[in-house]
Every structure is written in C-alpha cells, then in structure tokens.
C-alpha cells in the first residue's frame, strides 16, 4: 500500500514537471497579432468571418488552398501570452475547421558558425590580410575591406576561372600556388619554352610575378602564407619581362591562349618617370583587339592593368597607352587609411581602385614569395591589379557569360565612393556617377559586383558602337606660353545612323600636338552636359620637344552620359616659360557607347555603400584640397636641419615642410645602401658600418621626406631625389609597378634584424 502511494506521488510529480516545462516553453514564446485558420468555404467565407469577428483578412497562406491569415483589429502587435479567448471564438465558428494564433519561432542556419573572420582559415598570414577582412592595427583606421568574404560564403571562390599573370615568371611549384597552377595558361617568352619558372639571382629581382599570382590564387587552409582572393581559381604565368621586351613578345603574351585564359593581369608598363609617353605597338594593339573580339569564345578577354607608380615623379597615366586603352581595366591604389598613396598617378582612364601599400608605416599586401617563402611587403599598384583580377574571377564563376564590356559596366556601377570620400577630387558626372581622377569610380566591392552579375537578373549590355567626330576644315592653331587654344566640338553623336550613341562608355580624344616642351601642356575636355575632365596634367620632368603624334587621350569620366551637344576642348600652357611655342595640328573625338541604355542603368545609381554602416570615421585624417607652397632648392638647402636654439613654436610652424630633428646616421646609411644596392655586383662586399656616405646628408633628408610625401622643387628642372631614383630604377626599360625603393629598405632592415 505504501509502495502504491509512493508511485502515485512520483507520477503526480512527473506530470507537474511536464506541465511546468510546457508552460515555461510557452512563457518564452512571443505571440504575434496573426491567426491562421482553415476555412473550407474559401475566400468569400474568410472575408465574411473577418468582417463579423473584427479581423483584417491578410490573404491566403502561400499555395495552401482554404488556409487564410487574419490580423485582429484590437490586439497588440506582440505579446508574451496567447489570446486564448480570441482563438476560441474563431475556432468555435462552424465555418472554421482549425485556427491557431501565430508565434515567433527560433531558427538557425545550419552553416558552420565562426567566431570571427580571423577563424576562417588556418593559413598563418591570413590575419594580416587587412584588405580582405578588417584587422585594423589602430582604432583610427577606417573599417574597410574589399567585401570578399560574403562572396566566399556563397561558395564562390573562383572555380573554373583561369587567370594568367604577365610578368617575370612564376614559381609554380610554390606550396601555396602549385595546387592551382595551370600549365596551359603559362609560357616563357624570354627563353621560348613552356616553363615560366623565374630566374633566381642574389637580389630576388624576379619575385614580382610570383607575388602577383599569389594574391590571386594562394591556396586556402594549407597552413602556408595567406589566402588568394580567388583561391580556387587556376593561375598561370607568362615570363616576358626578364629579358628584352619587343612588340612581338608583348603581343604574344597579351594574346596567349585566349580560348583558355579568361583574365590577364599585368602590373608593369613604360617607365613611370614623369617624362615618358609610350603605348602598345602595332602588334600588341592588335592582340588587345583580337582578345576582346575572340577571347573567351567571343565574350572577350579581361585585361587588368596597374595604373602606375609615378606619382612622386609627377607622372600622369594618360601618357601610358596600356592603362589608357579602352580594352584594359586600369586599377589604382588606396592605402590602409583610405587615402591616395603618394606613388599613385592621376588620370582620366582609371576605372576603379583596390588596396595596396601607403605610407612607410602602413601595412602592405601579403602574398607568396620566391624560394617557397611568404611576404607581407608587396607594394604599389602592382599589388592592386591582382586583387582586382581575383575579384573579377569571382564574378566570372558566378556568371561565365559576362562579356569584357559587361565587366567594365559592373565595375563602374558597383565601385564605392564612400570609403574614399575623404580624398579631394570627387565629382558627379551627368549620369549621376561619382568619379575621381585618383580612384576612377571608387573602391571595388566584390559582393556588390558579384550580386549585380547574378545570371538570373543581369542583362548583357547592348552592342558597342563607335562614333567619330572631326572637323575636316580644321586649320592648325598656334599655342604659346600663358596662352590657350579652345575648340568647340558640336556633335549629334551619329544620330540617325547605325552607330548612333545615346549612352557613353569610353571617350577618346586623338590629337597631334607639336610643342617645344611637352610637359607644360594641360588638356581638358568638357562634355555636352558639363562634365570637365583633365585629359593631361602638366609633367614637370617632361622636357621633350616631340609633342604628341596621333595620341589617344582616353577618359571614362563621362560614362553613362548622352553625348549629344557641344563639347569643349581646352589646351593651355601656364608654365611662364616664354620660349615655349607650338600648335595643335589635328584632332578627332571618338565616342564609344551604345545606341540604347543598358538595362542596369535605366534607374539611377544609388550609393548605399556597405562601408557606410561599418566605417567609423572618427580619428581618420581628412585631406584638404589645397595647393601647398613648395620649397625651392635654395630654401631647402638653407633649412634642412632644425637649429638647437629654435623655439618650439617655430618648429611647430614648419611641421608640414620638414621632419623635426636631424636624421640619424643609421637611417642615412640605410638609405645609402638602398640607393647603392642595384649598383653592387654579386661579388661586392657589404658596406661596413663605418663606410663613408657618398650622398650628402641634405639629399638623404629630402629623400626621406619624399618616402612619405611627394613634392617638387621650384626653380630646378629635377630634384636630387629624382636623379637618385632614376639611377635606382634604371635596370630595365619596363618597370614593375611595386615600390622598389621601399622594397630595398625593407630587405635591408630584414637583413640587419
């Protein structure tokens, strides 16, 4: 009997626990003001019930026939308790088979949850890839990256896409590259064989191609180096820079296996010395044209080009015919701080920007390096272009049917203005697009680009048209110092013809200009709707009397505009060199675009940057667009060192003009070694710590300043610093677009440590 009583007590306690648990679950629920009901009478009966019982009929539930959703007119939106009396009244109606008040349900995605982006990969340098994920060293830096991780989370990693790097070779057996190496995308045009392996030397001169390839396709989760932007893509290397470069070699490289290679990445070009004007030869130009017409089975090869590192030399990438080509996507750089680096060039042909190195103290780019090593010091626009190529590979995996012009439109329409808004020079063109001669249309946004490229919604852009505008009666116009030539160019943009243009893409101004000092010319073009673009800025170091011969100045700044109306060309020389003279001999305006507006452009561009929410700009230095008074050679030599008896206020007043204090002999010796490094033979012994400096302290002081801040000297054709840089960079006629001086400094620091 006692046993039976104990059993009953246990049973009662168990029921009590279950009842408490059920009520506890209900207590945690959030009931909403919605009731689902099954009503066999259909829509008419449901409407009648709603009117009689004080509900709003929200409609049928999905595809379920005779199932309807109601909202009560006098019930709160959410409640922790269910409204049993309302539910009972509804379910008691003879026309209702079943009724239930709705409540919130907790659901979680069945993906692997990571604590942070830092835990995504086991590659040791992944946490240093700040440009792919936010790993700010200080809170003052903006929270910015290229927004690649959300694309990876969709499973898009570059699979099936082939990229080749045109450079000085590829260490294809590198642990972090080998799994993604594609021999069919590789060739050695320097030695004329199928192996692009780089030539080793004591200075590791030929590391550039391997570094660029690593940025694109470093393998993920293999405990080596970092992670490539398109880490499941295939990558090849074209060895063509480690030897004599000819037009034929360039053409062969640019046009290598276009039926197999999707993207060509190039981080080199003519000398960025501020005085060279050069572009593709006849053969290379034909290779570009063939690539966009026949490459990728007629969809067009994607050519990605680094915009150039001649900023400190006052160079202008409109004088570089590779970045100035309508067939290339020209990519510039932004620093970790979201600012334009001191080496970056300004021009009207730059389409967009990705990240790279900035000031001496900023983080640089991580990649694979020679001898199966890794690096975190890849620099310059050399490092920016491969990141862009990797992003384009993600887009091609998402939509393999994109054409070469589709890719350019995607870049224009999704690149971000907001992350770089602190920089001067932004303007809105006639199509409502923000554009800047430093950054093109802004910072690449991988997620936005891939989302827009979705094959379910993307429509290929209309057929490309070309309209040539010229004045057959034009007579040569003379130009002198402090003078100007203004040419008004009315056009109907081939209206009524098969090649009529209503929506612009590229604009080319082809001209022959004879002038006694080419670098003093300034050329602007103003579109029919008023967008003014600098086609050529002055270049202090360009003293050539050769002018321009049928040179194409290209601009993307009027993208999306209607070209109909009067354009205005203005050529000036404000140098004050009264001996200057010349003339504009002939010209023509070449409009590229479409006869109808592309589908994605029928609604205005809305700038809703993902960075707007993430980026805390507090503490981020703002750039001010002012012209600083530049020191003359005389004043620089007279004020190099801060006197010991100078007052603190005087020192503070000169902070923008010079670094306080005398540079240490250790730093001067470091710079001396960097300048001398390329001149040393393989057998030359290292300089001893007590070696005498062969370059004056004053010149080092100037060089040290210009590592972080470019400037020119009034009253002299070239600065001493520029002379040293010319010597430093004179090893090859074609220049890698990394920062070799910074690389040399870093190498020496690493050796000493």
Curated annotation (Swiss-Prot):
A GO biological-process term: peptide biosynthetic process
Broad EC category: hydrolase
Domain Peptidase S8 as annotated: residue spans: 129-450
P/Homo B domain span: 460-597
Catalytic residues (positions): 167, 208, 382
EC number: 3.4.21.93
Region Disordered, residue ranges: 633-663
Named cofactor requirement(s): Ca(2+)
Name used for this protein in its record: Neuroendocrine convertase 1
Organism in which the protein naturally occurs: Mus musculus
Taxonomy of the source species: Eukaryota, Metazoa, Chordata, Craniata, Vertebrata
